[in-house]
């Protein structure tokens, strides 16, 4: 969209005035960072029948929403964990952004310097949206990136259907689960997408909804009826069998599969939300986002104890052992040479009641849930 390009041009102009070597092309490229990372970590989809060795990628993100009968006072509550790598500059570059655009809705999101958005937030009309990485064989870089789509929704959506329309009309790049909620209407859906397909699932029988990093749009599963997105994820995750719901669920539990994204977190969210049903508050929501119990054994792990494997023992608030991604990297403008070694963990965690604008954000520690959740109010920040 031209208004976003204009905003990026303003960022580039400001950088130039500081003497930076970075220009508009760099800012544009930086705003595709998330999509480039997702795309790099995906298999080649040109031959869907081929066998391949996938690039291992970090596990990323999860969220839940609860309202009505699920919460203590009926208030719509939304929680999100942003999980990714602590690459150079990422931790010190975490930034809470309050945006009051000339045209559109005021909103808040967590981003990084130079980015117009990255992963969703809440807006002044009571809409929340967050993204969860969910790989598919249907990938492209010829479309709108996650940052652009997130910003479009936050700035323009007043209903869940508005978000669904935006994701339908604009071309998409990588596989993403968009968790969208409307606090006024007390409605939430998870829109599961890739470059080719889009489907959405509703809450199943109760006033709770959650998502992690795999598709759940499988006909007959949790009341869903529609296109099967799991078929396009089979090769991406090297799932053994997705011919039936039972075989698909067993494949997701495969602890020896090195490509799965800690699928036990989905089951753990269901367990915790069900146990707290009717009594969910912002405080108990923080406990859910900070949960470190093994989904299979119930064992509590220490903050910096890594799981046995990617799909064995990873928790909602997780921590992975450090990985060397490159022995030597030369940055193309600064000529800085360094190795890249990083943990996967929680970069930030948010709990919100979008209707009244209250939210609490943890982003000072790593993993972030170990630090304080600091209170803000969107309407106060916007001077409404």
Task: Give names to the regions the model predicted.
Residues 125-127, 137-141, 152, 244-246, ...:
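Short amphipathic alpha-helical segments, especially helix-boundary/capping motifs
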């Amino acid at each position: 969209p031209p208004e976003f390009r204009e905003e990026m041009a303003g960022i580039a102009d400001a950088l130039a005035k500081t003497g930076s070597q970075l220009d508009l092309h760099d800012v544009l490229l930086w705003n595709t960072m998330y999509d480039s990372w997702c795309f790099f970590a995906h298999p080649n989809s040109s031959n869907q029948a081929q066998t391949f060795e996938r690039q291992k990628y970090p596990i990323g993100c999860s969220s839940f929403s609860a309202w009505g009968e699920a919460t203590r006072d009926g208030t719509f509550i939304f929680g999100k964990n942003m999980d990714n790598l602590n690459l150079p500059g990422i931790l010190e570059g975490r930034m809470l952004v309050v945006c009051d655009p000339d045209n559109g809705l005021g909103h808040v999101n967590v981003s990084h310097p130079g980015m117009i958005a990255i992963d969703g937030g809440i807006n002044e009309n009571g809409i929340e949206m967050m993204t969860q990485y969910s790989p598919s064989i249907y990938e492209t870089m010829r479309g709108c990136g996650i940052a652009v789509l997130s910003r479009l929704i936050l700035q323009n959506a007043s209903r869940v259907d508005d978000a669904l329309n935006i994701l339908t009309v604009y071309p998409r790049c990588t596989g993403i689960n968009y968790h969208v909620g409307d606090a006024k209407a007390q409605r939430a859906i998870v829109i599961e997408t890739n470059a080719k397909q889009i489907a959405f699932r509703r809450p199943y029988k109760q006033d709770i909804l959650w998502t992690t990093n795999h598709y759940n749009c499988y006909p007959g599963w949790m009341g869903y009826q529609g296109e099967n997105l799991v078929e396009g994820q089979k090769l991406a995750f090297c799932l053994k069998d997705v011919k039936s719901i039972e075989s698909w669920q067993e494949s997701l539990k495969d602890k020896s599969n090195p490509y799965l994204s800690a699928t036990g977190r989905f089951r753990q969210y269901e367990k915790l939300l069900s146990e707290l049903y009717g009594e969910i508050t912002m405080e108990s929501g923080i406990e859910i986002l900070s949960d470190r119990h093994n989904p299979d054994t119930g064992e509590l792990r220490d903050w910096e104890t890594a799981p046995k494997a990617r799909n064995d023992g990873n928790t909602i608030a997780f921590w992975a052992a450090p990985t060397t991604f490159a022995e030597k990297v030369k940055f193309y403008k600064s000529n800085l040479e360094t190795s890249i070694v990083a943990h996967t963990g929680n970069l930030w965690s948010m709990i919100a009641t979008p209707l009244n604008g209250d939210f609490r954000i943890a982003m000072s520690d790593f993993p972030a849930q170990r630090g304080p959740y600091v209170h803000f109010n969107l309407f106060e920040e916007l001077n409404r």
